[in-house]
């Protein structure tokens, strides 16, 4: 019995380690961009881990109305990073959490509706969305490689210094080397090993402060509305609703992938229960001032690698995350990681997000001219909106935030163009089916003559 318990714990810890780096990146990126205090950043990291655990349990424990019942793990969504920073910069941090609460309620209430719309999210759409998410995050990773543009709201005098660039490139190279020579589970730890080694090197260089660790309490009960009462603004809410739809699209692909790994065909009812669980997870994130959550693809890869597909492993992993979230000192360790080290690691991860999107696009019919037009226009408009934000300066603030985020602009373009061209395809197919009997009849008459 003890041997079995140890095996379950070890396999569960493996799942936690596989997603840990990705889970803590979002609070680090958002917290630093919004210039929160060290104490507030420690809270964001702790509550993020706790909410990841709760969200995982909600999704894994198959209920009558909630939870898809697959061994899936949830983490903070990368697609929410840029919109959260934009909302926080324009409306304040309170508007961020008001919009997240609204998005969670929206997804929960309309889960059944989304369950009937999965045909609108083929690989040409999901692949484009995931590719845009990666492309939108890469600039943040590169800026962190240079040391981060700002420190506590002030310009960083060491931005672009040789030390920062060498440190970040060293982390990047180490991760690549580990991926080349390590195998199995050890390879899945390459990002964490790179971050740990980079932080150790930065500490030797005098670039690391552990004051946040010493100041953080050993135990902390999560506080609803840690940053104060949420503010409900129409612009941020619309933006976060779109983020929620993009999260649904992304999670749908992961649900199907894990269902295939586990040999369990998914029904519309299963998807609806999965969407409800994600809606509740996002709502909890808003109430406790955390983040929107979605299903993590890296854990699907780990399931494929280990061949261990039992739900109790992931349930235990969710419990481990909850425990970690109740111990702020552990969370504070992550806040001590220098921006340059984080940048070296995130560039790899964000690049992998792009690669995942390209892989999804490769499963689409790229001989179809309409698919190529959908991909081309969506990515072009998405990148354009991100790189030339000034073009929307004259727009009202709510609309400006919505359209200036490249991921949202590109995702909406992909969804609408796919729908438009799908209707065109159906009309052409109907026309061909109508013309075919006429053609056959004509040929028959010619043959008789």
Curated annotation (Swiss-Prot):
Segments forming a coiled coil: none
Disulphide bridges in this chain? none
Any one GO CC term of this protein is: plasma membrane
Bilayer-crossing residues are 11-31, 41-61, 67-87, 91-111, 119-139, 158-178, 191-211, 229-249, 277-297, 313-333, 334-354, 372-392, 401-421
The GO terms describing molecular function are: xanthine transmembrane transporter activity
The protein's location, in the record's own words, is: Cell membrane
According to its UniProt record, which protein family does this protein belong to? Belongs to the nucleobase:cation symporter-2 (NCS2) (TC 2.A.40) family.
Identification of the protein by name? Uric acid permease PucJ
């Amino acid at each position: 019995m003890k041997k079995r318990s140890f095996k379950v714990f070890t396999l569960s810890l493996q799942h936690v380690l596989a997603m840990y780096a990705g889970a803590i990146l979002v609070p680090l990126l958002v917290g630093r961009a919004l210039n929160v205090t060290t104490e507030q950043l420690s809270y964001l990291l702790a509550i993020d881990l706790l909410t990841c655990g709760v969200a995982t349990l909600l999704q894994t424990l198959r209920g009558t109305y909630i939870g898809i019942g697959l061994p899936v793990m949830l983490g903070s969504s990368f697609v929410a990073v840029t919109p959260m920073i934009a909302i926080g910069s324009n409306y304040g941090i309170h508007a961020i959490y008001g919009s997240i609460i609204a998005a969670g309620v929206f997804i929960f209430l309309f889960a059944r509706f989304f369950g009937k719309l999965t045909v609108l999210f083929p690989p040409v759409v999901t692949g484009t969305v995931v590719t845009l998410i990666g492309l939108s995050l890469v600039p943040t990773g590169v800026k962190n490689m240079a040391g981060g543009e700002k420190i506590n709201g002030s310009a960083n005098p060491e931005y672009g210094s040789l030390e920062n660039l060498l440190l970040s490139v060293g982390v990047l190279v180490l991760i690549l080397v580990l991926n080349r020579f390590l195998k199995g589970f050890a390879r899945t730890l390459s990002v964490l090993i790179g971050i740990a080694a980079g932080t150790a090197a930065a500490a030797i260089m005098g670039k690391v402060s552990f004051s946040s660790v010493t100041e953080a309490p050993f135990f902390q009960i999560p506080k609803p509305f840690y940053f104060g009462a949420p503010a409900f603004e129409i612009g941020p809410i619309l933006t976060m609703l779109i983020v929620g739809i993009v999260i649904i699209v992304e999670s749908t692909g992961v649900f199907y992938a894990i269902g295939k790994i586990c040999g369990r065909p998914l029904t519309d009812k299963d998807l609806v229960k999965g969407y409800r669980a994600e809606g509740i997870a996002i709502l909890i994130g808003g109430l406790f001032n955390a983040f929107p959550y979605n299903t993590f693809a890296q854990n699907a890869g780990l399931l494929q690698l280990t061949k261990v597909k039992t739900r109790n492993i992931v349930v235990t992993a969710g419990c481990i995350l909850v425990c970690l979230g109740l111990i702020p000192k552990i969370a504070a360790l992550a806040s001590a990681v220098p921006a340059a080290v984080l940048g070296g690691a995130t560039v790899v991860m964000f690049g992998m997000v792009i690669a995942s999107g390209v892989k999804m696009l490769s499963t689409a019919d790229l001989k179809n001219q309409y698919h190529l037009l959908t991909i081309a226009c969506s990515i072009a408009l998405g990148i354009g909106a991100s790189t030339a934000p000034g073009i929307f300066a004259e727009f009202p603030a709510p609309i400006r935030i919505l359209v200036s985020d490249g991921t949202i602009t590109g995702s909406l373009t992909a969804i609408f163009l796919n729908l438009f061209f799908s209707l065109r395809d159906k009309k052409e197919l109907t026309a061909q089916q109508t013309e075919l009997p006429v053609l056959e009849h004509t040929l028959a008459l010619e043959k008789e003559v």
